[in-house]
Structure formats: structure tokens, C-alpha cells
A protein has these predicted regions:
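Alpha-helix capping and inter-helical loop/turn segments
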Residues: 33, 125, 155-158, 174, ...
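Short solvent-exposed coil/turn linkers within tandem alpha-helical repeat scaffolds
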Residues: 137-141, 173-181
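N-terminal "domain-start" segment that seeds a small globular fold
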Residues: 181-211
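Alpha-helical repeat scaffolds
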Residues: 131, 160-170, 198-202
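Helix-turn-helix repeat elements of alpha-solenoid scaffolds
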Residues: 122-128, 157-164
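Amphipathic alpha-helical repeat scaffolds of TPR domains
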Residues: 140-153
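Sec-dependent bacterial lipoprotein signal peptides
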Residues: 1-17
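A non-transmembrane, solvent-exposed segment enriched in polar/low-complexity residues
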Residues: 19-138
Length: 211
């Protein structure tokens, strides 16, 4: 009888550990040709925050316990990024290189991997049309939001009117995310920039304000 409290404690601890693992998200991977053993993790959903990931000969494991759907990007040299979508109980594996990754996972991760490989397989002049088609077919996807940011909001020469049209067509939970708010702020900034450039052009000035 004396062993019952001990066995009960062990059982409770085991159950707690099992439940914890079911709520964990694990990112595993091995990336080739990394210029640093440190990868910056930039959280975009549900809120902005930063973390770091240390690699050992390109290999890494990163585990979190997300309360809700989470999105973050792996950043190397402040340039190349790999978006990752995290949810409870999921595992994602990344291989390849930082600029040509292979993402093994479910849901948004699978969707992201498919569009990454689709874009890599076509000429650069066909990428805008492919991106637009994907976004129009997946208006409630965080992958679409990422593509809008990468190929439109970060590109000064992108079609601003198309950016506005595609953004307005998005719906679902992504509309209320901080990432969407950030994208909308970029659109306002880009709109003001385009407006100022048009005024300067009409006045006979170049983009640097010189006549």
C-alpha cells in the first residue's frame, strides 16, 4: 500500500509529460552552406518577437509550446529567410540551403514548400504571375501574406495597385494578425512614396530631389 502514492505520482508526471509533448512544436533541420552557426528567429504571428537558434555543423532542433497558431522566419545574414508555421503537436523538418530550402510538414508548411519549389522551377519573368495566381487561389493563407510581403511590399518597383487589390482580397484570421497590420503600414508608406515620386517627376526633379 505504501507504494500507491509513489506510483500515483509517477503516473501523474508521465501523463503531464505526454500532454506537454502533444502541445509542443518541434523544428528540426540541417542546412548546408550556412555562413554562421547562429540563425535569427523573427516571430510575426501571433506577435512580434525575436529569438536565436544555434546550429552545430548546420544541424539544429528548436522546440516551443505555442498557445495558438504561430509564424516565424529563420533569418541568416539579415537577408535570406525561411518562413515556418508552428502549431501544437506538429513537427517540421527543413533541409537544403537557406535560399533553396525543402520544408517537410503539414498545412501551411506544405503549402509554402510547394510554392517555393514552383517558383524555383520557372523563369524569373513568370514569377509575378505565379505569385498572383497562388494568392488569388489561397486568400485565407498565411503563405499568401508572406508572398505579398516578399514580392510586393519589399519591392520598390512592384505594381502598387496590384498589391492593394491582392491585399484587400485576403480574408480569415490573417486579417487580424500583427503581420497583416505591418503589411498594411508598408502599403501606406509605399503609397506615400509613389505619390511623392510622382510630384517630384511633375516638377522636373529626379527621385533624389535633384533637378
Amino acid at each position: 500500500m505504501k507504494n500507491i502514492p509513489f506510483l500515483l505520482t509517477i503516473t501523474i508526471l508521465w501523463l503531464a509529460s505526454s500532454c506537454s509533448k502533444k502541445n509542443d512544436f518541434t523544428l528540426e533541420g540541417k542546412l548546408d552552406n550556412l555562413s554562421s552557426d547562429t540563425i535569427l528567429i523573427y516571430y510575426q504571428v501571433p506577435q512580434f518577437q525575436l529569438d536565436t537558434l544555434i546550429c552545430k555543423e548546420g544541424s539544429f532542433t528548436y522546440t516551443i509550446s505555442p498557445d495558438t497558431f504561430t509564424m516565424f522566419s529563420l533569418i541568416v545574414d539579415a537577408e535570406e529567410t525561411i518562413p515556418v508555421f508552428a502549431d501544437k503537436g506538429q513537427t517540421v523538418y527543413i533541409s537544403g540551403t537557406i535560399d533553396e530550402p525543402n520544408i517537410e510538414g503539414e498545412g501551411e508548411n506544405k503549402l509554402m514548400n510547394e510554392i517555393i519549389h514552383a517558383l524555383q522551377a520557372i523563369p524569373s519573368n513568370e514569377i509575378p504571375q505565379k505569385v498572383d495566381s497562388f494568392i488569388q487561389s489561397n486568400p485565407d493563407s498565411f503563405t499568401s501574406l508572406y508572398l505579398l510581403d516578399k514580392y510586393y511590399a519589399r519591392n520598390d518597383s512592384a505594381n502598387f495597385e496590384q498589391l492593394e487589390t491582392l491585399t484587400k482580397a485576403l480574408h480569415g484570421i490573417i486579417k487580424d494578425s500583427p503581420y497583416m497590420t505591418q503589411l498594411q503600414a508598408k502599403i501606406v508608406s509605399l503609397k506615400n512614396y509613389k505619390k511623392n515620386q510622382s510630384i517630384l517627376s511633375l516638377m522636373g526633379f529626379d527621385k533624389e530631389g535633384k533637378s
